């Protein structure tokens, strides 16, 4: 299991984070897939809470609102407690991220689009396999 700390979250070569440019409102901010760039390190603070995790991006905890993932600037008590499950068959640091209803994070088809929250597809193998758009690399920063 992951310990509380600073992490990067990727899907394949793309970075998962809030947009660098956002409106100034207090509305929930979209969590999106971004092109890889070495100019920025978009750090997540992952807080372990029992068997679940609060995922904070740029100071704001995340939640699913309907079928997408957002960062909450206000009403942060509404943050989702996520379960993060290792999927070692997909490599080191490979995980799926799920809510309590069994749905989970799914990367969109292209960079710039928002992380989707929906029922996960599980391959009928032992151990199970997952489509790569459901597998996220969570890398601890020292």
UniProtKB/Swiss-Prot annotation:
Inactive at pH 2.0, activity is restored after 10 minutes incubation at pH 8.0. GO terms for molecular function: serine-type endopeptidase inhibitor activity. Disulfide bonds: none annotated. It holds the Pfam family Inhibitor_I66. The modification N-acetylserine is found at residue 1. Keywords: Acetylation, Protease inhibitor, Serine protease inhibitor. Serine protease inhibitor. Active against beta-trypsin and alpha-chymotrypsin with dissociation constants of 0.35 nM and 40 nM respectively. Inhibits factor XIa, but not other enzymes involved in coagulation and fibrinolysis. Does not inhibit subtilisin, lysyl endopeptidase, arginyl endopeptidase or papain. This is Serine protease inhibitor. It comes from Lentinula edodes (Shiitake mushroom).
């Amino acid at each position: 299991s992951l310990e509380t700390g600073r992490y990067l979250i990727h899907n394949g070569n793309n970075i998962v984070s809030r947009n660098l440019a956002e409106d100034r409102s207090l509305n929930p901010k979209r969590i999106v897939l971004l092109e890889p760039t070495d100019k920025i390190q978009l750090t997540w603070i992952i807080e372990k809470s029992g068997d679940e995790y609060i995922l904070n991006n740029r100071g704001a905890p995340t939640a699913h609102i309907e079928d997408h993932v957002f960062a909450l600037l206000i009403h942060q008590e509404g943050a989702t407690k996520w379960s993060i499950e290792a999927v070692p068959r997909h490599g080191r640091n490979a995980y799926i991220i799920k809510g309590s209803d069994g749905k989970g994070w799914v990367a969109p088809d292209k960079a710039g689009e928002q992380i989707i929250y929906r029922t996960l597809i599980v391959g009928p193998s032992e151990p199970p396999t997952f489509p790569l758009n459901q597998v996220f690399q969570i890398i601890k920063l020292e």
